[in-house]
Each structure stands twice: as C-alpha cells, then as structure tokens.
Amino acid sequence: MSSDPTHQFLIQKIVPIEIGGIDFSFTNASLFMAASAAIAAGFLYFATSNRAIVPGRSQSVAEIFYEFIAKMLTEGAGKQGMQFFPLVFSLFMFVLTANLLGMFPYFFTVTSQIIVTAALAILVIGTVVVYGFYKHGFKFLNVFVPSGVPGILLPLVVTIEIISFLSRPISLSVRLFANMLAGHITLKVFAGFVASLGALGAVGVGGAVLPLIMTVALTGLEFLVAFLQAYVFAVLTCMYLNDAIHPGGH
C-alpha cells in the first residue's frame, strides 16, 4: 500500500538474476547505489575537469568538500591519516549523495537499509584491523590497553575496550540506518495526514495546514540530517583510523 510509511523501504527486483540458485537480482537498491556513486564521481569529475585559479561554483564546492575532509582527517588521525583520504572522502561523498537522493519523491534511500550501512561499517573496521596489524603487528593490540591504567584494573578495562571495539561496526551502521529510516517514516506520516485531510474538501483543508507546515519543516530538517549523518560517519571513520595509526595512544 502506498499509504504504508514503510513501503518506501521495500527492495524490489528490477532485473531478476539467479546464478547457481543464488539471487543476484538487480534491484532498486542496486540502482540507487550505482546512481549515488556515479553522481558523486560525475560531479567531482565535472568540477575538477576545468580547474581555474579563480574557481567556479562547482569547483568551489568540490574544494570545500576536499578541505573539509582533509582537515577532519588531520585533526582526527594526524598527518599520517591523509593516506586514508581517498577512503574517507569516497565514503563521505557516497553517503551524502545517497542521503540527498533519498529526499526526492519516489527515489530509494539506500542508507535506510541496514545491510548497506553494515557493509560500509565493516569496510571501515576491516580497514582499521588490516592496516593496524600490517603496520604494527601484534603491537596493534595495544589499542585495547589504554595508557596509565593501574594493573589491578587492567583486566576489566581491556574487556571493556574489546567490547567497545567490537560494537563499533554495529553503532556505526545502526546510527546511519536508524536516523534515515526514522526521518523518512516521519515525513511520510505527516505527508499522509496532509493528503488525507485535503481529500475531505474544504473542511479538511483547514486541518491540513498544520501537518503541511510540519512536513515542510521536517523536509528542511531532513536535508540537514542528510549532511550531518554523512559528517558523523566520516568523523567516526577518522577516529577509528586513528587507532590503527596510533594504537594505544588513547
């Protein structure tokens, strides 16, 4: 049902594909993930293809994003963190573009799918673990041993640190998924109120004013949330990468 606020999150097959009994179908989620990546890459290519000393609008926006992520990385993970700039910048642009695409009517919000946000979170944590062991070997395990902890408290603190580390991909994925899901459901509910009351004619139009105002206000808020969630995802990624670069430095 179109009135169902959760209907917008249903994954639907566009091109059914099954190989060896495994479903590889191209879905609306696949389409908008590809579109998000293509739009982000296309914008950056267009913005930087004709670079000038006096930047145009698109180049200015691209430079703002570049400096924004570069500053975030150096502050969160030090100068060595810049080696991860392509990863963090790509994640930020993908999440931001996917969030913004989901704001358009009849478009699909891929970041409202826990499987998508979980895959992004696993990519981040996997990078942290692989790089940590590659760079530091078993000294990477110092990330679970904060400096200055009394020996008597060490077993308890190490246990807490391990649990905290293992919960990172969960919190990173659920935070993005839950915020996008809740925001879009709320928008759908208020928009449904407007449509239902407006269908009652002159009597319902007056009652639809308040839900309409709320819908407009929530739409503006959701655009802000779309950026903030991409920002938070990038910030946390930088913090986690710092543990791989400087284990035991917290």
From Swiss-Prot:
Location, primary (coarse class): membrane
CDD domains linked: ATP-synt_Fo_a_6 (cd00310)
Entry's localization field: Cell inner membrane
Cited InterPro entries: ATP_synth_F0_asu, ATP_synth_F0_asu_AS, ATP_synth_F0_asu_bact/mt, F0_ATP_A_sf
Ranges that cross the membrane: 29-49, 84-104, 114-134, 143-163, 193-213, 216-236
Gene Ontology MF: a single term: proton-transporting ATP synthase activity, rotational mechanism
Topology of the protein relative to the lipid bilayer: Multi-pass membrane protein
Leader peptide range in chain numbering: none
Family annotation (Pfam families): ATP-synt_A (PF00119)
Keywords: ATP synthesis, Cell inner membrane, Cell membrane, CF(0), Hydrogen ion transport, Ion transport, Membrane, Transmembrane, Transmembrane helix, Transport
Keyword Transport: yes
Biological role: Key component of the proton channel; it plays a direct role in the translocation of protons across the membrane.
NCBIfam families linked to this entry: ATP_synt_6_or_A, PRK05815.2-4
HAMAP family: ATP_synth_a_bact (MF_01393)
Name by which UniProt lists this protein: ATP synthase subunit a
Originating organism: Rhizobium johnstonii (strain DSM 114642 / LMG 32736 / 3841) (Rhizobium leguminosarum bv. viciae)
